[in-house]
């Protein structure tokens, strides 16, 4: 495994440990060059409450690897979180920089009513 990936996973592990101590619902993000995924995971980590990604039927037709697609995923996860009764979450960026697509998703989720 490359040093860059190891460093990202180390950052992710530290952040998840801190979130686990809080025991709150977390918004976990995963990013690949082509797609972006978001999951709401319960405080104990046992269940996925809601999920959204660029692989969803409504989002799959357009471009999937850009900031506009990330905004759409952020709005969709916020909508599904509200439907599940979740308003407050901890943002788990999985060790990725808070920039670009990650930031676009987070901003759209905040606009949709999620509180970080």
UniProtKB/Swiss-Prot annotation:
NCBIfam families referenced in this protein's UniProt entry, alphabetically: L18_bact (TIGR00060)
Gene3D superfamilies on file: 3.30.420.100
User: One matching Pfam family, short form?
Assistant: Ribosomal_L18p
**Top-level division of the source organism's lineage:** Bacteria
Q: What this chain does, per the record?
A: This is one of the proteins that bind and probably mediate the attachment of the 5S RNA into the large ribosomal subunit, where it forms part of the central protuberance.
Tell me its family. Belongs to the universal ribosomal protein uL18 family.
**Disulphides:** none
Write down what this protein is called. Answer: Large ribosomal subunit protein uL18
Query: What keywords sit in the KW lines?
Result: Ribonucleoprotein, Ribosomal protein, RNA-binding, rRNA-binding
**BP GO annotations:** translation
A GO cellular component annotated for this chain's UniProt record is: cytosolic large ribosomal subunit
Q: Which residues does UniProt call coiled coil?
A: none
Q: Which organism is it from?
A: Cellvibrio japonicus (strain Ueda107) (Pseudomonas fluorescens subsp. cellulosa)
Q: How does it assemble?
A: Part of the 50S ribosomal subunit; part of the 5S rRNA/L5/L18/L25 subcomplex. Contacts the 5S and 23S rRNAs.
Question: Which taxonomic lineage is given here?
Answer: Bacteria, Pseudomonadati, Pseudomonadota, Gammaproteobacteria, Cellvibrionales
**GO MF assignments:** 5S rRNA binding; structural constituent of ribosome
């Amino acid at each position: 495994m490359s040093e860059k990936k190891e460093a990202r996973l180390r950052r992710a592990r530290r952040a998840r440990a801190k979130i686990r101590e809080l025991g709150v619902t977390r918004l976990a993000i995963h990013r690949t060059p082509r797609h972006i995924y978001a999951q709401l995971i319960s405080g104990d980590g046992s269940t996925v409450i809601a999920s959204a990604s660029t692989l969803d039927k409504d989002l799959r037709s357009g471009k999937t690897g850009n900031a506009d697609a990330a905004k759409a995923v952020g709005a969709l996860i916020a909508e599904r979180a509200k439907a599940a009764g979740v308003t407050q979450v901890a943002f788990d960026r999985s060790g990725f920089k808070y920039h670009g697509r990650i930031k676009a998703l987070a901003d759209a989720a905040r606009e949709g009513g999620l509180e970080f």
